[in-house]
């Protein structure tokens, strides 16, 4: 039996490995592949750490110069998994690097003394967790966040369908996971109906809101000043990564309707689209700007980068 097939001795401190290969918790949310999942993983890890559980978040290194370990918060570390090539790797390319990533995962695991549980996020991370779990006996739970079959059922115009290889990979993760954590009842239902997940192994954990950060107060004035917006303007916003299926064009079309119906509002309204391009929608920002110009509301619609 190889070293990889031997379950490590349990670490003296309760320790969980969280895996999110295709995006880093250190990246700015709202750009590229960094989005809501990043926030979800970070905040969940901090909460577990506050309960006495050490959490190591594993992500694929995008440069050989990145440190092996970065402390994100007390009890939470980011660990970089090194695999070549570093650059020019899309989400769909990650499975081809899996042998290298798994090997480097074992290097980290040996360093810390092992994990009691692996929690993987997104399907490519689930492939790594499935392999490590099968070789060591460490249980793994998985959160998909999105799935190929659901995305392909509701593609926006111009969006590229998710490949069959992703659906097959997701099916294998569903079968192997000790448990699957869904964010909503509808997501749980889709895993059962589309992926034949065992209902007894699917759990719904509804995401919450950090009320210490998001609360009623006097932050509106500060936010307007930060974004360079007139304090007296009526503000309409789209906040998120710029992808067709998120519907940023809906805001632009709605603003055009409002301006046509009530021209007097033109000088009183700003519509803000805040976010960066992501996924297959790399040309989406230019399309949105052209749409605003074509509808005659480019003076009302403003595009801003993500704000931390």
What are these regions (language model features)?
Residues 108-125, 129, 138-139:
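Short N-terminal targeting/anchoring amphipathic segment
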Residues 32-34, 151-172:
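Nucleotide-sugar donor phosphate/pyrophosphate-binding loop at the beta->alpha transition
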Residues 61-63, 163, 168-204, 209-211:
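A short, active-site helix/loop in glycosyltransferases that binds the activated sugar's phosphate group
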Residues 215-229, 288:
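A short helix/loop element that forms part of the nucleotide-sugar donor recognition site in Leloir-type
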Residues 1-78:
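N-terminal subdomain of nucleotide-sugar transferases
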Residues 16-17, 133-153, 163, 181:
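Active-site proximal beta-strand in glycosyltransferases
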């Amino acid at each position: 039996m190889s070293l990889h097939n031997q379950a490590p001795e349990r670490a003296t401190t309760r320790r969980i490995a969280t895996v999110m290969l295709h995006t880093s918790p250190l990246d700015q949310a709202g750009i590229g592949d960094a989005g809501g999942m990043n926030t979800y993983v970070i905040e969940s890890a901090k909460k577990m750490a506050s309960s006495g559980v050490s959490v190591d978040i594993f992500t694929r290194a995008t440069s050989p110069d990145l440190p092996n370990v970065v402390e994100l918060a007390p009890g939470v570390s980011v660990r970089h998994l090194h695999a070549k090539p570093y650059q020019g790797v899309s989400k769909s390319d990650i499975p081809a690097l899996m042998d290298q990533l798994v090997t480097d995962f074992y290097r980290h695991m040996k360093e810390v003394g092992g994990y009691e549980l692996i929690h993987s996020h997104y399907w490519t991370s689930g492939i790594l967790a499935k392999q490590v779990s099968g070789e060591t006996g460490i249980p793994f739970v998985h959160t998909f966040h999105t799935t190929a079959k659901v995305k392909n059922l509701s593609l926006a115009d111009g969006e590229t369908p998710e490949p069959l290889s992703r659906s097959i990979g997701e099916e294998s993760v569903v079968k192997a996971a000790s448990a699957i954590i869904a964010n909503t009842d509808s997501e749980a239902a889709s895993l059962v109906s589309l992926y034949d997940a065992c209902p007894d192994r699917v759990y719904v954990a509804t995401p919450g809101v950090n009320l210490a950060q998001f609360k009623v107060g006097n932050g509106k004035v500060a936010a307007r000043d930060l974004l360079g917006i007139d304090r007296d303007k009526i503000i309409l916003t789209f906040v998120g990564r710029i992808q067709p299926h998120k519907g940023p064009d809906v805001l632009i079309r709605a603003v055009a309707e409002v301006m046509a119906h009530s021209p007097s509002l033109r000088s009183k309204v700003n519509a803000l689209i805040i976010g960066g391009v992501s996924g297959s929608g790399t040309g989406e920002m230019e399309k949105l700007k052209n749409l605003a110009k074509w509808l005659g509301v480019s003076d009302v619609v403003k595009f801003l980068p993500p704000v931390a």
